[in-house]
Amino acid sequence: MFKIEYNVSRNSTSVRRGQFYLNAFQLKKECNNYVVSKNKNTFFRDMILKMQQTIKFKDNMKSINDDYIYLKNNYCHSYGIKNKNFCSFDYFIFSKLFIIKKTSSFSNLFVLPKISEFFVQKKCLFIGLNKSKYTNFSLGHNISSWFYDDKLCCLFSILNFLADTSLNSIFSLNRKRYYSIIYSLDRDKIFKFGKIYKLFDIFKKKFILSCDYKFWKKFVFKKMLVFLNNKTKCITFILNSKHLGSVFIYFKIINNKSIILDLVTCRNEIKKIFQSHIIYLKNVLKDCGIEVSSINVSSREEFLNAVRTNYDRKFDSKILNHYNTVISKTKSHALRFYELDKNDYQYNYNNINMYV
């Protein structure tokens, strides 16, 4: 039997605790049979009922151990889950994990700590978390399982780029260390940018953590914006840090095979760290099958000068010029995704469609 402990936060002051038990053998053998403890908590009873017709063990998945369970089309309430001692087994893969309750303009994506992978299945993105040496969370190990087909990519393990304090700041529901990733994504809008295997996972494990961890622990991003330009197949991340300023990360996918990567920062110390690791990062990416056309590290002014005459990148330079204004318009939300209208290259807030 597997024991699962949890905390459920219904508001800032009320916390409900409980536990339930699942029998792994029955989960594998019969998808409609569940073993739940006699002390059935309402929260998990409802969750189990919603899962009842959809839970499934997938035998053809690459099994890490006997407790490797595949949960398909699960639905559950959008309450936070406490990280400490969450479950006794380590490996889950979730597919189509959506949340019923929505908060403001976001759909809360219910994420369990200690999940070691995330998996893309048609119209959603799943983030897997597990403990690592340097931070409480690390995204993904078996990167090949991220992709539903060759046309998909998982650039959003950019979260690996963040230190533990950053994750706490951005993704805590009520600042009491209840974790829930705050977005779900539509594949048709997001995953049009080719196939990239380990880019951001490498950013953390091979790139960021090779630097001084005490330095990066200050890297607390209060806001993160993601802009998608469908016409040019470009993705732009803007990360804003109270201590270290803003970091602008720009990707252009070329023929679904190679990438151009620009790292733009206003702080010289960040620029120097990036520059000192460019060759190493490029070699690691190449070993993973990602052909990097170029990796450029520059200041804000250098980047603007470089793209000033490039029509395809005018929008990206406009974002960089106005990111402070954009960030101020996101109110209290930490993460939002934007898509530029396909026919509009003028920077106009009315033509930016927020779809998360």
From Swiss-Prot:
Mention any Pfam family matching this sequence. Flg_hook
Source domain of life is Bacteria
**Which keywords describe this protein according to UniProt?**
Bacterial flagellum biogenesis
InterPro entries the record matches: Flagellar_hook_control-like_C (IPR021136), FliK-like_C_sf (IPR038610)
- Output the GO biological process annotations, alphabetical, semicolon-separated: bacterial-type flagellum organization
The family line of this record is:
Belongs to the FliK family.
Q: What is known of its domains?
A: Two-domain protein with the central portion of the sequence acting as a hinge or connector between the two.
Q: What does this protein do?
A: Controls the length of the flagellar hook.
Q: What is the protein's name according to its record? A: Flagellar hook-length control protein
Provenance organism: Buchnera aphidicola subsp. Baizongia pistaciae (strain Bp)
